From Swiss-Prot:
It is found in: Lysosome. One of its GO terms (cellular component) is extracellular space. Undergoes a post-transcriptional proteolytic cleavage near its C-terminal end, which reduces its size by approximately 3 kDa. The site of this cleavage has as yet not been determined. Belongs to the glycosyl hydrolase 2 family. SUPFAM superfamilies: (Trans)glycosidases (SSF51445), beta-Galactosidase/glucuronidase domain (SSF49303), Galactose-binding domain-like (SSF49785). This is Beta-glucuronidase. The active site is at 447 (proton donor).
Length: 648
């Protein structure tokens, strides 16, 4: 690497190393209440990529000091969305480095003049590094592409007459061995093959590294003394539901808290006062997963009211599901009853939008999950939007909540620098998602090279840290390492195993699946005596490609492979296998390679959500299992999801 190039990337690294200074404290989902206002900044933003050789021109020329359009040509960029697929420019689709977003807005006069009001800027997802300015003044930086961060901008907007409000966000999608997910920048130095300075981003995960503002950017207000955080855990004592709460208030030490728990009909069923306490709910309605109860996903509302001697008030309402989770040697229990994960793995991925949040797509996906008879999914391989988890709470879809620890394959990615960042990511993930009843387990990684010696200490530390953050949920990671070589498996509560028998090896030989899968399960259980989830399995199928006898990439081969897996899963779920998650719910985009024809085709639905033959095979299976394991009458093919209109 040339000295100049080394200096450029060193400067970039210095900028990025500071990206963990976002607002500390709670991370309650922003919503309108009697004391809080919300302004959503979705829509068209000004956008430009920094194509300079060192990618630092925007910082060197301080693009944030004036409107972005004055720095040079800009594009209209929709937010939320990935920037990659919006234009016809291949250079932008594959761009690595800094891109710049900007949006101007008008604030209500009361926000800028009411000194009893606090104004907060929240970015729900900026992939991967982000630096944020308001009216040219630096307000926050953040590392990590899938979790929200905030900045209190009250002083900026209330410091004097405000004629304009301009938000500038610089985002860098460069991945290093120490990021989550990791990656490397590889320079191609052969002058006979590559132009000077040519580089590519190398990644060890099989999905496209979409980038941009993937979720909403919002402004919201609170009183200057405000409810900062709420933590809820639940338990059951016979037929009495127990709701334990802890509330954090910022801005003053002088306040009173009143807590009310309301049922779905709006009736108050319990009251409390103070920062912490326990609410007892006689004859409680429990939160049950979809297809496990005739009235699944029952949600109470926890209403918190804070008042101060100065007559300042703050209100916040949190949906609460009363349920318990436990793990034995061979069972996963929800409310004391065995639960079988009959579900899918997903991606936040769609045409044009990339990883951008999209309500129509989200509702379509949930309707397909219910049609399928699926009761669960894993957020492979990163945290999904909060709106996804809110719908899971409402619909009774159980979630294995996974952090972006995918592609951890290099020895340096198991060092102290990576571990420190990984611990911070789990802090952020648990802080955001701790109150969702649908979240029943944390996953700290997917397919790490956990046979490496440092992996033992790494996962022991990481899992212990996650358990300390949340003692109420089991912790796992998803492995594709041999059972007798996995250094992290001793520390998980549930074994999650990925295997692609007759796909990535023994190509086309469906006849070996049953023997190999039986051996897989028996070896893992014999060594660890823990329940097992088949966390990934599947085969690529090009929609409309048919071959009989089945051949690879045909829909027939995909269904035949699934059916061979199902024969053994049916045997082992009577013993210690507690779930199966197909890979994947829908086709999704990947990097270009000879092994991928416009992405990964292992979906049982196409990227446009049209079913392949495998979707009908899986639907028949999941509804059969639901009827076999039901604890009440015949399972209806459609279930009502609550009687009250639902708002987030």
């Amino acid at each position: 690497m040339s000295p100049r190039r080394s200096v450029c990337w060193f400067v970039l690294g210095q900028l990025l190393c500071s990206c963990a200074v976002a607002l500390q404290g709670g991370m309650l989902f922003p919503k309108e209440t009697p004391s809080r206002e919300l302004k959503v900044l979705d829509g068209l933003w000004s956008f430009r990529a920094d194509y300079s050789n060192n990618r630092l021109q925007g910082f060197e020329k301080q693009w944030y000091r004036q409107p972005l359009r004055e720095s040079g040509p800009t594009l209209d960029m929709p937010v939320p969305s990935s920037f990659n697929d919006i234009t016809q420019e291949a250079e932008l689709r594959n761009f690595i480095g800094w891109v710049w977003y900007e949006r101007e807005a008008v604030l209500p006069q009361r926000w800028t003049q009411d000194t009893d009001r606090r104004v907060v800027l929240r970015i729900n997802s900026a992939h991967y590094y982000a630096v944020v300015w308001v009216n040219g003044i630096h307000v926050v930086e953040h590392e990590g592409g899938h979790l929200p961060f905030e900045a209190d901008i009250t002083k900026l907007v209330q410091s004097g007459p405000l004629t304009t409000f301009r938000v500038t966000i610089a985002i860098n999608n460069t991945l290093t061995p120490y990021t989550l997910p990791p990656g490397t920048i590889v320079y191609k130095t052969d002058p006979s093959m590559y132009p000077k300075g040519y580089f590519v981003q190398d990644i060890s995960f099989d999905f496209f590294n979409y980038a941009g503002l993937h979720r909403s950017v919002v402004l919201y207000t609170t009183p200057t003394t405000y409810i900062d955080d709420i933590t809820v855990t639940t338990d059951v004592d016979r037929d009495v539901g127990l709701v334990n709460y802890w509330i954090s208030v910022q801005g003053s030490d002088h306040f009173q808290l009143e807590v009310r728990l309301l049922d779905e009909d709006g009736k108050i069923v319990a009251r409390g006062t103070g920062n912490e306490g326990q609410l007892k709910v006689p004859r409680a309605h429990l939160w049950w997963p979809y297809l496990m109860h005739e009235h699944p996903a029952y949600l109470y509302s926890l209403e918190v009211t804070m008042t101060t001697p100065e007559s300042v008030s703050d209100f916040y309402t949190l949906p609460v599901g009363i349920r318990t989770v436990a793990v034995t040697k061979s069972k996963f229990l929800i409310n004391g009853k065995p639960f079988y994960f009959q579900g899918v793995n997903k991606h936040e991925d769609s045409d044009i939008r990339g990883r951008g949040f999209d309500w129509p797509l989200l509702i379509k996906d949930f309707n397909l999950l219910r049609w399928l008879g699926a009761n669960s999914f894993r957020t492979s391989h990163y945290p999904y939007s909060e709106e996804v988890l809110q719908l899971c709470d409402r619909y009774g879809i159980v979630v294995i909540d996974e952090c972006p620890g995918v592609g951890i394959v290099l020895p340096q990615s198991f060092g102290n620098v990576s571990l420190r960042h990984h611990l911070e990511v789990m802090d952020e993930l648990v802080r955001r998602d701790k109150n969702h009843p649908a979240v029943v387990m944390w996953s700290v990684a997917n397919e790490p090279v956990s046979s490496l010696k440092p992996a033992g200490y790494y996962f022991k530390t990481l899992i212990a840290h996650t358990k300390a953050l949340d003692p109420t949920r089991p912790v796992t990671f998803v492995s594709n390492t041999r059972y007798d070589a996995d250094m992290g498996a001793p520390y998980v509560d549930v074994i999650c195993v990925n295997s692609y028998l007759s796909w990535y090896h023994d190509y086309g030989h469906l006849e070996v699946i049953q023997l190999q899968l039986t051996s897989q399960f028996e070896n893992w259980y014999k060594m660890y005596q823990k329940p097992i989830i088949q966390s990934e399995y599947g085969a690529d199928a090009v929609s409309g490609l048919h071959e009989d006898p089945p051949r690879m990439f045909s829909e027939e081969y995909q269904t035949a492979l699934l059916e061979n897996y199902h024969l053994i899963l049916d045997e082992k779920r009577k013993e210690y296998v507690i779930g199966e998650l197909i890979w994947n719910f829908a086709d999704f985009m990947t990097n270009q390679s000879p092994l991928r024809v416009t992405g990964n085709k292992k979906g049982i639905f196409t990227r446009q959500r049209n079913p392949k033959m495998a979707a009908f095979i899986l639907r028949e299976r999941y509804w059969r299992i639901a009827n076999e394991t039901r604890g009440y009458g015949s399972v209806p093919r459609t279930q009502c999801m609550g009687s009250r209109p639902f708002t987030f």
